From Swiss-Prot:
Biological processes, Gene Ontology terms: nicotianamine biosynthetic process
Reactions accelerated catalytically: 3 S-adenosyl-L-methionine = nicotianamine + 3 S-methyl-5'-thioadenosine + 3 H(+)
Organism: Oryza sativa subsp. japonica (Rice)
Enzyme class: transferase
PANTHER family named in the record: NICOTIANAMINE SYNTHASE 2, NICOTIANAMINE SYNTHASE 3
One annotated GO molecular function: nicotianamine synthase activity
UniProt-recorded name of the protein: Nicotianamine synthase 2
PROSITE patterns associated with the record: NAS
Tissue: Expressed in roots.
Length: 326
């Protein structure tokens, strides 16, 4: 136990130092200094760690919350930079692999789809919402092109400039794919009747960064989504909670959802994935989300991960080498 406490203390000290350095940056736009500091931060947070961020003291907790906001701002600058770069090409979708973390989106989207079909059997979505899509809507793109070819995607973001950048990526895209992707400038808190039309809602990790904000978003979704509709929530686990908010499963249950599965990656995919379903009284909703009944899905064995990674890399190359089609 003492060794674990020392490990946690050393990690928190390292991350606090990186937070201090990042806070002093004149800008969070992509640069050698910005890239180096955030690379160091991710490198520190990705390995398995005994840290429980919920048990941090007030000072460390405040540092963590501010760090998540800095990460969000830096991510926004990075995505805007690459969205503008991609938009300069005649067919932007041919060049997606230029984004350094594109492969992570391919892997994360496949993971989410696999969990969805495994734990929500028989689901065949025709209308999907992605809340917090940003200027590079890679997740919707990968899901629409490779996993949900019959679904129409409504992408929501509060930032009009982000949506405009996202639309520009589809210049020259296959008409079938482009016709299935719509972008709306709206805060999820203002959506009501629209939410009842979706079979699946994906909630991005940085929508609602503070715990109470996240709980409020989930409660709003629960109040307006259709009974039986699926909710896929991105979260974090362990030290990765210094990069992204950790979603409390009780907040999901209180929002009116059955929590079906939780997955904590142990590789370069940063986000945990939570699959839930809006409780449906006609199907005995509420039983699957009982305390202790949620399967925490283990990452696959190393050989399986290598095979999956090889397949994802090949898919990423194919995705970037030709125009998307459905």
């Amino acid at each position: 136990m003492e060794a674990q406490n020392q490990e946690v203390a050393a990690l928190v000290e390292k991350i606090a130092g990186l937070h201090a350095a990042i806070s002093k940056l004149p800008s969070l736009s992509p640069s050698a200094e910005v890239d180096a500091l955030f690379t160091d931060l991710v490198t520190a947070c990705v390995p398995a760690s005994p840290v429980d961020v919920a048990k941090l003291g007030p000072e460390a907790q405040a540092m963590r919350e501010e760090l998540i906001r800095l990460c969000s701002a830096a991510e926004g600058h990075l995505e805007a930079h690459y969205a503008d770069m991609l938009a300069a090409f005649d067919n932007p979708l041919d060049h997606l692999a230029r984004f350094p973390y594109y492969g992570n989106y391919v892997n994360l989207s496949k993971l989410e789809y696999d969990l969805l079909v495994r734990y929500v059997p028989g689901i065949a979505p025709t209308r999907v919402a992605f809340v917090g899509s940003g200027p590079l809507p890679f997740s919707s793109l990968v899901l629409a092109a490779h996993h949900l070819p019959d679904a129409v995607f409504d992408n929501y973001d509060r930032c009009g400039a982000a949506n405009e950048r996202a639309r520009r990526l589809f210049r020259g895209a296959d008409e079938g794919l482009g016709a299935r992707m719509a972008f709306h400038t709206a805060d999820v808190a203002t959506l009501t009747g629209e939410l009842g039309a979706y079979d699946v809602v994906f909630l991005a990790a940085l929508v609602g960064m503070a715990a109470e904000e996240k709980a409020g978003v989930i409660a709003h979704l629960g109040a307006h989504m259709a009974d039986g509709a699926a909710l896929v929530v991105r979260s974090a686990h362990g030290a990765r909670g210094f990069l992204y908010p950790i979603v409390d499963l009780e907040d999901i249950r209180r929002g009116g959802f059955d929590v079906l599965a939780v997955y904590h990656p142990d590789d370069e995919v940063i986000n945990s994935v939570i699959v839930a379903r809006k409780a449906d009284p006609r199907r005995g909703g509420g039983l699957a989300g009982a305390r202790g009944a949620v399967p925490v899905v283990s990452p696959p064995c190393k050989c399986c991960k290598m095979e999956a990674a090889a397949g994802a890399f090949q898919k990423a190359e194919e995705f970037a080498a030709k125009r998307l089609s459905v």
